[in-house]
């Protein structure tokens, strides 16, 4: 027998999260209840936003809900439904799957500035990183960042610059509206890139990068080594 129902709208905004919950209630009432009066779990899936920084919030056209707001709108609707309808023998557990919501702040991404060029009145910053290291989506937002200058003397004052990756893909852009003082050799730390980053990096141009843990703001500890040539080709049977 079926004891669990799952949906995954990945709604994000609070009004869409409410719609997702109402759709689940409609399914339970009009479809599922015809086949069973037992249900142990209801999962509304994921798609919730993280407790993101103001830099990210300002790039979105709606208010970012808190975790409490997500919980209130879904749990109240589900609870009211079960109290009113009394279709099932026992009230099931309500589950959510906060993947991105928890993982996004787990990682930052550090790149080095290789060159800065000016083309048609716009500065183009080339780096040792790629958007494929953090999120290959064409709809990705500009990440919050911090610049570490090796020297203040040779910095250029960049406004609305493009920060680009090392691949030959025209859309490999890490930041589309970069404003900071910068020079070659500086470091840029892109923050809040833990969601869909490592797992979506293809072995294209360069393999994946190492991961370090910064302990007590003073010590680096390697927790995953960078990929090598051998990692990329070890699965192939070489005919030579």
Label every model-predicted segment.
Residues 73, 83-85, 89-240:
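Charged (often Lys/Glu-rich) extended helix/loop segments that serve as interaction or gating elements
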Residues 1-112:
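Active-site loop/helix belt of alpha/beta enzymes
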């Amino acid at each position: 027998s079926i004891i669990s129902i799952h949906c995954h709208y990945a709604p994000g905004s609070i009004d869409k999260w409410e719609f997702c919950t109402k759709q689940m209630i409609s399914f339970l009432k009009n479809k599922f209840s015809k086949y069973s009066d037992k249900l142990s779990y209801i999962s509304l899936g994921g798609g919730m936003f993280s407790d993101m920084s103001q830099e990210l919030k300002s790039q979105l056209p709606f208010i970012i809900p808190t975790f409490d707001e997500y919980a209130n709108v879904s749990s109240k609707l589900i609870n009211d439904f079960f109290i009113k309808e009394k279709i099932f023998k026992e009230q099931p557990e309500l589950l959510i799957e906060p993947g991105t919501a928890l993982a996004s702040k787990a990682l930052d991404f550090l790149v080095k500035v290789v060159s800065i060029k000016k083309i048609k009145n716009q500065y183009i910053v080339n780096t040792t990183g790629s958007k494929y290291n953090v999120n290959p989506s064409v709809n990705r937002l500009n990440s919050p960042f911090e610049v570490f200058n090796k020297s203040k003397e040779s910095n250029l004052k960049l406004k609305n610059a493009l920060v680009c990756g090392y691949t030959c893909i025209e859309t490999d852009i890490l930041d589309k509206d970069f404003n900071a003082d910068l020079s070659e050799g500086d470091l840029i730390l892109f923050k809040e890139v833990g969601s869909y980053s490592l797992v979506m990096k293809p072995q294209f141009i360069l393999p994946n990068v190492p991961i370090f843990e910064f302990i007590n703001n003073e010590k680096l500890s390697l927790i995953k080594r960078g990929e090598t040539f051998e990692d990329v080709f070890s699965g192939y049977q070489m005919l030579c």
